[in-house]
Design a protein with these regions (language model features):
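Conserved thiamine diphosphate
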Residues: 2-145, 149-153, 159, 169-170
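Alpha-helix capping/termination and helix-coil
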Residues: 161-165
Length: 172
């Protein structure tokens, strides 16, 4: 995929990755190569690749079906990493990833694949810009910044603390 992008900047490659991000480790060398292309070419080239991986826990999958790998992969400059929380985020970020220049690691939270609480209306041709957070719950006492399926855990905690203590927690 990295080499194929070199022929034409209009080529965008989407790689449907492993069923579980846990199985991505043997391919991490290729990931590293893609993250280095921009720096290696002095800004002349960046691979237009979107790599999709199912990631995360909370599905009862055990040791090799619950890993969250973004922490290790964010230490390598040269890739954007996105991790949606709701259906509109998922659709919008995937469209933006596929249409943008550069390398994007698109992590899909497995726990939300069939989660009713993550379902939202998705407008046609909807995109979510990179680097723009969404306030999912307004509040004034404390701000929680989160992503992926833990957004839903934080929303539940915010609601509980509001009912029990009257605290207004913002969830971004």
């Amino acid at each position: 995929a990295n080499g194929m992008c070199r022929f034409d900047p209009k080529i965008h490659v989407v790689i449907e990755g492993a069923e579980f991000a846990d199985y991505f480790w043997p391919a991490v060398e290729q990931y590293v190569e893609c993250t280095h292309e921009y720096w290696r070419s002095n800004g002349q080239f960046t691979p237009n690749i979107t790599l999709r991986l199912a990631s995360g826990g909370y599905i009862g999958g055990g040791l090799y079906h619950s890993q969250t790998i973004e922490g290790a992969l964010t230490s390598l400059p040269g890739a954007r990493i996105v991790y949606p929380s709701f259906a509109d985020d998922a659709a919008g970020l995937l469209r933006t990833s596929m249409r943008s220049k550069g390398f994007t690691l698109y992590l899909e939270p497995k726990a939300l694949y069939n989660a009713v609480e993550a379902s939202t209306f998705v407008p046609e041709d909807f995109e979510v810009p990179f680097g723009k957070a969404r306030i999912r719950r307004p509040g004034k006492d404390l701000t929680i910044i989160t992503y992926g399926n833990t957004t839903h855990l934080c929303l539940n905690v915010a609601e509980l603390l509001y009912k029990e203590k009257g605290w207004e927690l913002e969830v971004i």
